[in-house]
Structures are given as C-alpha cells and as structure tokens.
C-alpha cells in the first residue's frame, strides 16, 4: 500500500484499539499487487497536483510522478486516469509512470483494430525523411514511402502537407514501433470506383475534356479524371506531327474524342484531329493528279522532302523524284527549309493520307532530249569524267553521264588493261549502244566504232561444224589448236574424250591433227571452243541410226566397224 494512503488512514485509526490499528496496517501492507506489471497500462487515481507534477497512485508501494506536459487536458485530484508503468521501482524508489505512453498504447490498439479491418485512419503529413514522409496519426508517427504518396509523381509535395487526410495502414510492428501507411491506396480505391463508373459510360464518338498526363515518342496519355486514354501521334492532327511535344504541353487541357474503346482490356483510344472534318475527303478534287503548283519545303527525311500543300497538309517528294539525273539524291544538298519550289501531283492516297509529288517532272527529262538527238548507233565525242575498275564515265552535258564498260573498249585487247591508257578530261569518240530512260542509263562503246574482226570467223565456223585442227600447245586444262593456220581454238580436258580415262592432254602430241566439233565461239576473243567428245557421240548416234539398233543380232563393234569402213 502507498505511503500516502497510510498517512491518510492510519492516524485516523489511532483513536482505535492499538492492536486493531497495527493489524489493519499489516493488512494494508499485504494487499496483492502481483497483477500490476511493468510495460502495461493501468488505471490510477490522481492524489495530488504539485507545481508541474501530477502524483498518481496505481495501487503500488510508491506513487508515480508524471509531468503535466504529458496531459493534453489537466486532471483534478481524485480523477482516475490511465497510465503506462515504465518501472515499478526506479532508482529513487519511486514508480515511473507515463501518461504519454499510455495514450500511445491505447492508440496503437485502436490502430491495430483499424488495420485488421482495413479501415482508413486520419493523419497529417508533417515532415520529409529519406525515402518518404512522416505522418502524425493523432500522436503516433507513421512512415509514408514516396511510392505510396500518389498514383502519379507529385512535383510539389507541400500542397499535400499539414492537411488532415485519410491513410491506409499497410503494416505495423509494435516491437520496433514502426507503422507504414499509404495515401495512394486511398486514391486508387476512390479512383477505381470512379473509373468503373466512367468506363460504364464511355462510348465511341464521345467528346471529353482531359489533361495531358504524360508525353511519349508515340503519343500522349490524357487524364480523363478517373481513367487515362491514349492519344496516338497519328491522331493529333490531320497534318504531320513529328513529336507530340510540338503541339502538346504537360498538364495542358485538351478536348478529345473517343475513337475506340476496348471493353475487354479497358483501353481508350483518343483523337484530336477527329474533332475537325477530314480534309482528305476534298483533297482529290483540290489536288488532282497532274496539277502543277508551288509550295514551301517544310521538312526533310532520309527518303525525301515534305512540301506544304496548304495549312496542315503536306505532300512528299521522294528522293527519286527530285532530279532526273541524280537518283535518290540527298534533298538537303539542293533544297532548304522554307524554300519555294515547283512540283506536280503524282498520286493522292486518301486511305493512307498521302500525297506523292514530283519536282523533276516539272521539267523536261534531259535524257529524253538526248535520246531524240542521239539515237542508238550515233557516234559522239565526250570528255572523260571518271575512270573506275569496270569502265569509263563520260560527260554528256546537263549533268548526264554515259558509261563505256571495259568490255566495250576493244575487240582484241583486255579492257581492264586498256583503262590505264585513258586519263580524266580526255575527249574520246564512242558510239551510243543503248539508252534506258527509266533507269537513266546511257551505254556507250569504243570498240563498236570498228567492225567485229571475229564476225567472219563466227560465220565460217558455226556451232556444230566438224573441223580439223592442228595441236599447237598441250596444257593441263586442255589443248590449244589452230584451224586453217589462222584461227585459234581450244579443247578443254573434259572434252577430249567420252571416256574419262582418255581425258588426258598429255596423251596428245603437238603438230598432230585432231578432228572435233565446234561447240561455241568466244565473242570477245574470237577463240573457237571445240569438243572431241561431242564429235564422237554424234558419230555414234549417226552410226546407230544408219546401221540399226544395238538390240539386233549385230553387235555395237560391228556397227561401228562398218561405219568406219564406209568413211574410208
């Protein structure tokens, strides 16, 4: 029993029987206080208020002293209050009590119940810490992670600080004294209900007002209040927009039309250009194919240049349609942004929203004029513009080039060797061999200025003719031969016999005559390609035809013997 109680009751008993008083005092000493434990909340009575201290009796040997500052509302003597027992007996023998901790214990209990039920708790964001914010839950401090502040990043968090607002308790650890709360969960739940309501009303064709929430390369996300929609780059304007940031700003208010609603995936596609009439509906009439007009260069691309047809509408001039003579040239080299150019309409594709234009077709094709003045067979003189490994390029005027392939330089000599004898700037004579206006190519030749020396040979030694030739050289790859002492010929190793073991050049001797069949003539060199094998096969087939089939009683050897005898 506390000393104060003794002081209050024992003197009053002094008038009583001394023995009774002594027994009563002992009884008070033996009052059971075992149910009172440290770190628990108990009820106590205020027995005295002294200066800044409130003395509370909780039924222990000693009273406890609590600073007035721990009480929000000051109690009076005799009031019963809940207190937290820190220590039953401190260093000075007094019981250490705390009203503040008792309140927190009570609040913790309430918060635990609310957390288990999923109920929201009111609190105030009052400070910033690493990774988030601190929240006052009526006396208990909780942690609000940065990721749980809002459904989207907040640039200025001061707008939500020092305001009483609801939070959801995510986790509690009484041992560590940690509470984690979420503001975002409240917003999401509220947003989810509003979102479901909004989605139930969404219909294609609806016009809504929203706020630009995010801008990407492919479009912008529009906040419609409780749900987001995607405004694709191609649905911002009927004209060309390279990037959404060219016409939209973050947090900008915009009017949009619902152009598609995917109910299954809850996706909303939005459009701004659909709020205006489609200019393409009248474009075919306004810009008919073949119409020649002028416009300003607005932008460049790897594949061409864009020209403004009218406000909000552009057409494309492909690289191949800029110049007649420089196919797929870089438009940046000849044109500048803002430059006024003349063009002609090639095609209007209303489905793909494309207008194809041409600059070069506003002028006469210089190659067409060249072809008219220099038909195939014409002999011209032109300066050498460039020399490559495969031929010579000559200047034809008006930035046109003609090409002499190395194979068209000489009938007899190798063209690649002759290229070294020509110099850039030299004027040479050549003949027009072919003109391809579509491909913008002019083929020329030098050797065609003189007759083909092998034409006579080609006429005399036609394919299939049987000739006799003199062996002039034996090589691993075959035999070099001479026909009529003037025309060179060659028999490949594989053409020496129809028997593989006889296809050996070393079996033949120089200056010996050999009979073979003309297989082909190399036009560039005039060399005749011959075949002994083809000749023998032809002879065999002829013999079979004249003397009968090998299925008869006469054997093949007899047939061939008879054929050879007749030849004699």
Curated annotation (Swiss-Prot):
Keyword annotations? Repeat, Ribonucleoprotein, Ribosomal protein, RNA-binding
Gene3D superfamilies given for it?
Nucleic acid-binding proteins
Which GO biological process categories is it annotated with? translation
Output the Gene Ontology terms for molecular function: mRNA binding; structural constituent of ribosome
Q: Which GO terms describe its cellular component?
A: cytosolic small ribosomal subunit
| Domain S1 motif: residue ranges | 39-100, 118-184, 205-273, 290-360, 377-447, 464-533
Family per UniProt?
Belongs to the bacterial ribosomal protein bS1 family.
Per its database record, what is this protein's job? Binds mRNA; thus facilitating recognition of the initiation point. It is needed to translate mRNA with a short Shine-Dalgarno (SD) purine-rich sequence.
Q: What is this protein called?
A: Small ribosomal subunit protein bS1
Q: Which organism is it from?
A: Rickettsia conorii (strain ATCC VR-613 / Malish 7)
């Amino acid at each position: 029993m506390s000393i104060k109680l003794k002081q209050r009751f024992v003197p009053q008993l002094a008038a009583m029987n001394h023995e009774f008083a002594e027994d009563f005092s002992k009884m008070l000493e033996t009052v059971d206080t075992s149910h009172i434990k440290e770190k628990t909340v108990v009820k106590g009575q205020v027995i005295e208020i002294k200066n800044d201290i409130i003395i509370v009796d909780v039924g222990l040997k000693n009273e406890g002293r609590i600073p007035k500052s721990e009480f929000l509302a000051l109690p009076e003597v005799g009031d019963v209050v809940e207190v937290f027992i820190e220590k039953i007996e401190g260093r000075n023998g007094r019981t250490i009590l705390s009203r503040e901790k008792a309140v927190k214990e009570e609040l913790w209990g309430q918060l635990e119940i609310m957390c288990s039920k999923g109920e929201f708790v009111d609190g105030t964001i009052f400070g910033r810490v690493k990774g988030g914010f601190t929240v006052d839950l009526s006396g208990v401090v909780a942690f609000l992670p940065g990721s749980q502040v809002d459904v989207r990043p907040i640039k200025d968090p001061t707008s939500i600080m020092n305001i009483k607002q609801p939070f959801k308790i995510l986790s509690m650890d009484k041992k560590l004294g940690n509470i984690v709360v979420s503001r975002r969960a409240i917003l999401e739940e509220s947003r989810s209900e509003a979102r479901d309501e909004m989605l139930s009303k969404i219909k294609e064709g609806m016009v809504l007002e929203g706020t630009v929430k995010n801008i990407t390369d492919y479009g912008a996300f529009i906040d419609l209040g409780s749900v987001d929609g995607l405004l694709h780059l191609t649905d911002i304007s009927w004209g060309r927009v390279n990037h959404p940031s060219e016409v939209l700003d973050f947090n900008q208010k915009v009017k949009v039309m619902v152009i598609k609603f995917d109910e299954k995936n809850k996706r909303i596609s939005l459009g701004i250009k659909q709020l205006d009439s489609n200019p393409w509906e009248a474009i075919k009439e306004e810009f008919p194919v073949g119409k020649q007009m002028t416009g300003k260069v607005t932008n460049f691309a790897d594949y061409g240049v864009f020209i403004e047809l009218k406000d909000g509408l552009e057409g494309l001039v492909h690289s191949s349609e800029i110049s007649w003579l420089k196919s797929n040239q870089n438009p940046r080299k000849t044109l500048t942004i803002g430059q006024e150019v003349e063009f002609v309409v090639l095609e209007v594709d209303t489905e793909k929203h494309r207008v194809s234009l041409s600059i070069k077709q506003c002028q006469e094709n210089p190659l067409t004029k060249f072809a008219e003045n220099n038909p195939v067979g014409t002999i011209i003189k032109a300066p050498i513009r460039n020399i490559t490994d495969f031929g010579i390029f000559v200047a034809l005027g008006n930035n046109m080039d003609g090409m002499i392939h190395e194979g068209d330089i000489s009938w007899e000599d190798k063209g690649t060797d002759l290229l070294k004898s020509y110099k850039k700037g030299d004027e040479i004579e050549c003949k027009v061999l072919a003109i391809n206006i579509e491909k913008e190519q002019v083929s020329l030749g030098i050797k065609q200025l003189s007759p083909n020396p092998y034409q006579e040979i080609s006429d005399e030694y036609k394919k299939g003719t049987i000739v006799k030739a003199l062996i002039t050289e034996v090589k691993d790859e075959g035999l070099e031969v001479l026909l009529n002492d003037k025309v060179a010929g060659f028999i490949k190793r594989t053409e020496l016999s129809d028997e593989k073991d006889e296809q050996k050049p070393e079996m033949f001797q120089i200056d010996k005559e050999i009979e073979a069949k003309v297989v082909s003539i190399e036009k560039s060199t005039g060399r005749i390609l011959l075949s002994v094998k083809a000749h023998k096969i032809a002879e065999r087939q002829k013999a079979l035809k004249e003397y009968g089939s090998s299925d008869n009683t006469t054997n093949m050897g007899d047939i061939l013997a008879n054929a050879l005898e007749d030849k004699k």
